[in-house]
Amino acid sequence: MAGDWSSDVCSSDLEDIMEDNFTLCQGVSVGGAEKLRSCCHIQGDNIRGVLSCDIMAKVACGVIEKLAEPIFFFLELPDSERDGYKTYYLDNCTKEVALAIMKRYGTVLVNDGVSRFGFGSHKNDEEIYFTDYQEFQIYSRNPKKLEKLFDRLGIDVVGEDEVVTLWDLINEDNTGCISCVEADGETVFDIPENLKSEGMYEAE
């Protein structure tokens, strides 16, 4: 995974984390986002919520640390020909490799508005999935093991009706917009080719 990065997106310094304002990713535009907060709802083995851009990579790295090896990385890219997504996988990763992917590509993955990505465990199917408009989903057999991570990052665990997302702000007068972004001369569309030599492939 050749290439440079400007900072460690997995850094967990509290000074870098505990911010009061909800921030949008570069590829996401919705009016009124400052009203939101990073939060999630836990129901059984499933967690869903919305995250401020500044902590998305830290959540990804924190969950990766708790996934059982081997780990897989997946990336969904828009496919205009099929009006859907092309999905790419990189299987059988160690935690070190999964974290290296975030360190190398985390900035563009998090800030891009049109793609979706995540990491999961081949061993027990636990998974984190980042979707449109800064929402995320986690499947975990033991959600309690993530409570310390959520608390440290300032993610409120709330009732289902209390999860307010960017989608809730979108209407005829406040239309949302997502776009592809570039970081260090690369976009998310470069990732499958860059990782092809490591074994990344397109799902059939």
Predicted regions: what is each one?
Residues 7, 129-204:
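Acidic, proline/glycine-rich low-complexity IDRs
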Residues 44-126:
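Surface-exposed, low-hydrophobicity interaction/linker segments
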